[in-house]
Each structure stands twice: as structure tokens, then as C-alpha cells.
Amino acid sequence: MRLSFGKQRYHGGTTVTLTEQGASDSLRAAQAIFQNHSNEVSSPCPPVTVSRNPQTRLSEPSLQKSGRKQEQKKARIRTKQVPKIKTTAPNDVELSKKHRSSPAGKDNVSSTAQMAAALAHSQSKLSSDNNSSHSSALDTLKVLETPNLNGLLGIHSRSSSRNGSNESLTPGQRTPDNRSQENLLTSFSSGRRLSSSSMEPATNKDSNKALPKRRPSPPLQSSLVGSGQLHENENLSSISIDSRHSLNPDTSDVISNRSQTSLSQTINQLSLCESEPSIASSNTTTTTSNQGSGLPNLVPNYSSDMRKKKLVNKFKRKVFGSKPKHLSSQYEMDASSEELGQHEQQPSMRFKTTLRKTSVSTNAENDHASSLHEGNLRYKYNPSNDTYDVYDDTDSDSESDQNQDALTKPRKRDRIKRKIRNSANKTAHHRPIHRTRDRKFNEDKPWKSHTDITFVTDNERKRYESMWVSNRHRHLNLLSWWPSLTGDSGAINTLPEDGLILGIIVRDIWKRSNLPNSLLAEIYTKVDTRKDGTLDRKSFIVGMWLVDQCLYGRKLPNVVEQCVWDSVDRYASTMVVPVSTLKAMAKQKRKQMKEEIKNIKKENRVVLVDHNSSS
């Protein structure tokens, strides 16, 4: 029975070229696969698998019973989940009446045949390119040929429907029936494969407990091949050779689970799967050392111990400070040769390190670096810019005896203390209670030199008189009674010798104090003795003194005392007794008065007693 295939076929966006020999081989391979499945269904026997976890192993009768019961109960439900796609059966292929009415079975047969054809074509192409005489996929499957095709179609439709329902399940949650079908499909295709990641643990029906989800094992694991177990090294060495000529390790998964995919996607997936064994064989050392531990260690020469050591060293540096490093640091560079696999060590390279800020010539730098390497090195602290200058013992300028302590580099703690002491703000100490020097009078802040006294001091009088001299005799001709306007010469003879100041000028001067006008008018009325719009020297000085007293915070007195008027013309004592001293003196005076009263009373008693005794 032959099928007539075209030489080129456009499918899924790609053009596939099939020869007549490849088409016939693909058809025969598909028939052999179908017949093998039908024979396996008639006498189910689960293949021998090796599980890494001993708790997941089950006996063969439990797999048979669970497979039969679940196949009877869920066959009808799962067949409804198969997508219905209109396809045509291959030429000269007769289907049984039982399967002709189901379009899902026809679709699965046609798609499976196409995938098997693509598989055989890819295998034949690889064998022709490599010029090898090994057996192809067709020779591997010839042994399994049986004449029964009707049973094959039935088991294929059931397997496709069950695979559609179990796609969303994890390996630990799949039913034993579905797992047995997968093992049947993988039994003949994984003959020379070292391990298979699709092997999954079976569930225990008696315990009725689902196994926990676990991460799939690495691809390279030990498995039973035929009747004996091969060593791991032999399998790893032979897998790179057999992977090109044997069936793909994942062919069973593609046939059972990928019945609805396009031909182009199948070819791409087959090419990717074929490259996996060769990659695994080249990385045997990495995978064998990391079996069951997840991803391999991709960072060479690195382990958790090195990471812990780095963290401990970092913590010690933070707590105890960094250790003093030699300025003559040496760095070694290793160059690895890929051809010989030997490591050659280059000569050590010495880098110049110095703490000098000024640049020097190249020869001086080399001499300085050599002196640093020899160990003739000392430091001297420079307090001006808070740095350390480096000096050699051979320098003629260095002082040997006097600055021996200054040339040694202090500890890190001492340097930090010195830096804090120089940079921190110094706390201001409390000033002494008694003033040791006289403070100058501040015209902007006159209240700072104020003392509670009842007379004009000498300093105040001098300030007021300076303002008087600079503003007197100005604009007096504006007055109505001024003699120059009336021509009366007698009025000039009655004016005071010190002169007069115009009231308008006094008002302008006093307004600079920012006191209210009402308060200034009240002060003017208290010191105005002439009542003619002018002020004489005494009135102006006393008025200025009252303005300053108001600025100091004292209340304006109702009547200006006579001692204030007298202090303007007389030189008062500059010694001012503090208020506390006056209070102490008053207290002492009251105490003396009490003592005198007691003495007087005592004397009176003595006089009375003497008088009574004499009488």
C-alpha cells in the first residue's frame, strides 16, 4: 500500500519537500506505531521505570485496575472534549465502521500520520548528510508491525481525548490511566535514552493522598534499558552518537499531546529536541554534580562559603575599621591558555601610591615608590589642611629627636577625634555676672546701657549737647517775635547766651524715636519753660533724656524732679550704685535702727530699776 505525496507541500507558512522514498517510509512508520499501540492495548503491561523518590513507586496490578476503571467511566466524557476538524483520510486506507462516524478520530489519524512522516523525513535527511550506515527510524519500528489497525485507531482516539483533559494537571495529579498510556508511548522510543523528564511518579490509590508538587528532575538521570542497567559514563558517551540515528526522546510526547499542532511547529520542535542530547553530553560535569538541586552553579569559583566570608569581613570593617594596607600593593594577573589548559602567572605589577598632593617628576616618583616598598616611611600631621604628609627616614630635613612622636601616624580613632575637635562648634560659656570692662554706648540700642537712675549722666549729657550745638540758631527768623522783623533791638539782649532751638526742629528730632505723637507732645509740655515755640539748652537736654527713658521702658513721670534739672548743669558722680546694693544698704540700716531701739529700751529699764530702788 503506497500513498502518493507531492514533492513540495506548503503548510503552516513553510514549504516541506518530501521524496517518494521519504513518504513511503513515513507511512510505514506510522502504520508500525499504530499496530504497536493496538498490541499494547490488548495486553497492557506498564514499562519498568525508575523513580528517584521511593515513596512514589506502585505495583503493576494497581496500574491495571485504575486504568480499566477510569477508561470505562471517563471515555464518553473525554471524547467530547476533542476538537472537531474536517479532514480526509489517506488514500487506500480503510477504517472500521466503529470509527468512521467519529470525525475526531479521523483528524487525529491524519495529523499523526503527517507528524510521523515529518519525523521519518528528518531522520532520513540526517542520515544522508552524515553518510552513516546506522539503522533509521523505519528499521527500529519494523519489528513492532502487526496487522491489526482497527484497535490502533481506537486507542489513539482515547489517548488524544485524555491528553486534552490532562494538559492542565500537574505531573503529581494525573491519573494512572493517562500515565500508563504515556509510558506505553515512551517504551519503544526511549530505548537508548539515558533519562526522560516525562517520567512522573504514580499515585497510591489505597492511601487516597495526592503527592505534593515537586520540581521536575534534571534531564540526565539513571534508567533501565532493556534487561540490564548501564553505567552512567557509558550512557553519557554513547548518547551523542545515538541521538542522531535513534528516535527523538520526546517523540512519544509529540505523538500523544501534539496531535492538533501544525506541521511547521512540529518540525521546529523536533529540531530543538534533537539538539538537547548533544548539549547535555557536553555539560556532563555540571549536571551530574547538581542532580536534584535545581539550576547548576553558573558562577565559577564561587560558593556560599566565599559569600559568607565576604559578609563577615565587611562587618568587621564596619565595627573595627579597615586594617592598614601596605602602600606598595602588588597585583597579580593570571592568563589562561585555552589550548594547553595551563595558567601562567605574570610578574607582579607595582603601582605608586602616595599621599602627597603636589605633583613631582617621574624620577622622584619612582624613588619615592621604592622607598615606600622598602618600608622607610613615616607620616607627619599637617593641622592646616588636616592631612598627613609622607616622609622618608633618609630625608635630611626630617628631625630625628624632637619630632619623633609627630612623625608616627596616629590611630584612626585619634584622627577622628582630632577632626571632630577641629570641626565641631564650640559651646559658648556663660559670661561672668560682673562686667570687667565698660561697654560703649550703642546709639541704635540705647537701652543696653541703661541703668535705673534719677539724673542725667555725663555721657548722656554729652550726646544731647552735641545734638543741641548742631541744631541751634536755625530758622529762628521764622518766628513772629524775632527782632529782625520788628526792628526791636531790646529783645535780642534778653535771649540766653547758649542760644535757642526751634520747636519744629525738636519735633523732627524726637519723631525718629517712633514714639507716638501724643507722648512726644506731653514730654514737650513738661520741658517747655519759655512758651514761645523755642527750647533752651536745659529744656532740650531734659526732653531728650525723657524720650530715652520712655524707650528704655520707664513710664513718663507726672512731674520732672529737681535733681534731673540740676544734673544738667552740674557734674554728677559717675559711680552708680546698683539696685541690689541699695537694697542691702537699706536692710542693714533697718537692722541698725532695731539694735538702737533695743539698746534704748534696755537703758530705760535700768533707769527705772535704779529709780525704784533708791526710792
Curated annotation (Swiss-Prot):
Q: State the Pfam families in the record.
A: EH (PF12763)
For whether the record's keyword set contains Lipid metabolism, the answer is yes
Keyword Phosphoprotein present in the record's keywords: the answer is yes
Q: Where is the composition biased (Basic and acidic residues)?
A: 365-377
Q: Basic residues bias located where?
A: 409-438
Low complexity bias (residue ranges): 121-135, 157-168, 184-198, 281-290
Q: Which CDD domains match?
A: EH
| Boundaries of every EH domain copy | 460-571
- Per the record, where are the segments of Polar residues compositional bias? 50-65, 248-260
Question: What's in the keyword line of the UniProt record?
Answer: Lipid metabolism, Phosphoprotein
GO BP field? lipid metabolic process
Which cysteines are disulphide-bonded? none
Q: Where is the composition biased (Acidic residues)?
A: 389-402
Q: Which residues carry this modification: Phosphoserine?
A: S180
The coiled-coil segments of this chain are none
SMART domains documented for this protein: EH (SM00027)
Q: Where is this region: Disordered?
A: 38-135, 152-260, 277-304, 323-445
| Family from the record | Belongs to the IRS4 family.
What does it do? With TAX4, acts as a positive regulator of INP51 activity and phosphatidylinositol 4,5-bisphosphate turnover. Negatively regulates signaling through the cell integrity pathway, including the MAP kinase SLT2. Also seems to be involved in rDNA silencing.
| Subunit and interaction comment | Interacts with INP51.
> What protein name is recorded for this chain?
Increased rDNA silencing protein 4
Q: Which gene encodes it?
A: IRS4
